[in-house]
């Protein structure tokens, strides 16, 4: 206070609080300390290599496949980085990123571009998983028109926005599909469909669970029946060096076979 020639604290018999000048000084001091810490970290990285733990969250579908590919390649460049991965639906993943429980995450559209940085990385069609013996079962797996699904029980993902998205595939707004269940995890949807509870409507990556002919996979024949995936991270939040490096890596290597 003597050096600056201004009061940084308001003092009373029972408490002390920052003045406006004190708040401003604290803000700049925090930025300076952060810069010092990051500079020390940069020097350490140059000497010892990138280290730390990368906290990741992902939806099902293509999320695990994409992350497995990226981490495998990223690890070759930065072998000392460790990983903690968490899986859930998009709403749960969004919440974890918002609360700072993970730095980088994979979700499906729609995306919250006001709160998160969004890097679109992949898309795949939606499909119908139909149990053997069902009238719509097909050994040739040809595409299916959404209206053909109207008379039958459907199982869809649990995310709130999915029901409206799926309703939009049907030509008659007065004829809505029968939603028998909303299921959070693909494996549950697969088992329910295989046992005749309903037709599972999920992104095409659910077909990776199929091991026999007890179900068939038919692509939904509609231009809007696509699932879009994106990498997200929180705006206005300082990322770890590991997270920054990983995001830069994905930007350059987002295409995955």
Where are these regions (language model features)?
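Alpha-to-beta junction loops
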Residues: 97-107, 126, 193-200
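Secondary-structure junction motif
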Residues: 137, 142-146, 152-174, 239-247, ...
């Amino acid at each position: 206070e003597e050096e600056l020639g201004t009061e940084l604290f308001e003092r009373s018999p029972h408490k002390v609080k920052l003045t406006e000048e004190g708040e401003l000084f604290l803000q700049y001091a925090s930025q300076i300390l952060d810069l010092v810490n990051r500079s020390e970290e940069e020097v350490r990285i140059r000497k010892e290599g990138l280290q730390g733990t990368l906290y990741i969250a992902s939806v099902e579908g293509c999320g695990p496949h994409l992350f497995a590919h990226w981490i495998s390649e990223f690890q070759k460049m930065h072998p000392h980085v460790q990983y903690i991965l968490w899986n859930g639906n998009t709403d749960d993943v969004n919440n974890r990123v918002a609360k700072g429980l993970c730095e980088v995450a994979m979700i499906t559209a729609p995306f919250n571009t006001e709160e998160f940085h969004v890097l679109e990385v992949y898309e795949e069609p939606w499909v119908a998983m139909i149990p053997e013996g069902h009238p719509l079962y097909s050994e040739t797996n040809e595409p299916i028109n959404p209206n053909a699904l109207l008379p039958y029980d459907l199982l869809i993902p649990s995310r709130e926005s999915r029901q409206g998205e799926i309703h939009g595939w049907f030509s008659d707004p007065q004829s809505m599909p029968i939603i028998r269940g909303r299921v959070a995890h693909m494996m549950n949807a697969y088992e329910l469909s295989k046992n005749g509870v309903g037709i599972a409507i999920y992104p095409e990556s659910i077909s990776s669970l199929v091991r026999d002919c007890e179900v068939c996979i038919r692509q939904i024949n509609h231009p809007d029946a696509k699932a879009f995936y994106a990498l997200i991270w929180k705006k206005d939040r300082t990322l770890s060096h590991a997270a920054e490096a990983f995001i830069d890596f994905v930007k350059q290597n987002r295409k995955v076979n």
